[in-house]
Design a protein with these regions (language model features):
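Nucleotide/pyrophosphate-binding catalytic subdomain
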Residues: 1-204
Length: 204
């Protein structure tokens, strides 16, 4: 979704959705590109980014800055009054630094709490929150946090106040049984299916 034309189209469609809405974004491809330009090595384990001090600076610049503000600007152009946030902004989401075992992911956060009142207040004011995948621990430290997890946690929290639908958007047509075959979309995944696919390595 980081391709400019694809993102523009997605945001145009998002802007046409009636009623209250929240947008959560990632930006991993852009972060990797900027890191490479800065001579910083990108290390991934099971699809998750190892975030040392240097990489934390990169993802904060890219996620909370470049990507987030570009999305906000495009939404404003579409007539959507939006506000870009990290978890540290107005303290909307706190995380705990992930323990370094069995894998030390560095400055990566696991969500601890969502400030539902803050998000609900923004929504009530007609503001669309645009949430970047950077949170904080409440002790002055920023943490790289999975965007899908942020979307999930925000949806669960807001479901206490609103009728919530959680929609994931990505480049493929769905979850693929074979990542090299775009026609191998799995139309429905139950919890049992998920556990079986994870066990046999179809998904990770």
């Amino acid at each position: 979704m980081e391709e400019a034309s694809t993102l523009k189209s997605l945001l145009e469609q998002f802007s046409k959705i009636p009623g209250n809405k929240v947008l959560v974004h990632g930006g991993g491809r852009s972060a990797t590109q900027v890191a490479t330009q800065l001579g910083i090595e990108t290390k991934m384990v099971e699809g998750r980014r190892i975030t040392d001090e240097a990489m934390l600076k990169v993802v904060t610049m890219v996620y909370a800055g470049l990507v987030n503000k570009n999305i906000v600007a495009q939404l404003q152009a579409n007539g959507i009054n939006s506000l870009g946030l990290t978890g540290a902004d107005i303290n909307y989401m706190r995380s705990d630094k992930r323990k370094p075992n069995p894998i030390d992911y560095g400055f990566v956060g696991d969500v601890r709490e969502v400030n539902t009142d803050i998000l609900a207040d923004l929504i009530a004011r007609g503001i669309v929150p645009v949430l970047s995948p950077i949170t904080h621990d409440g002790k002055g430290n920023l943490l790289n946090t999975n965007a899908d997890t942020i979307a999930q946690e925000a949806a669960v929290a807001l479901a206490k106040r609103f009728d919530v639908s959680l929609i994931y958007c990505f480049e493929k047509d769905g979850v693929l049984k074979d990542e090299n075959d775009d026609s191998s979309v799995i139309p429905l995944i139950t919890k049992a299916d998920f556990e079986a696919y994870k066990a046999d390595g179809t998904i990770s």
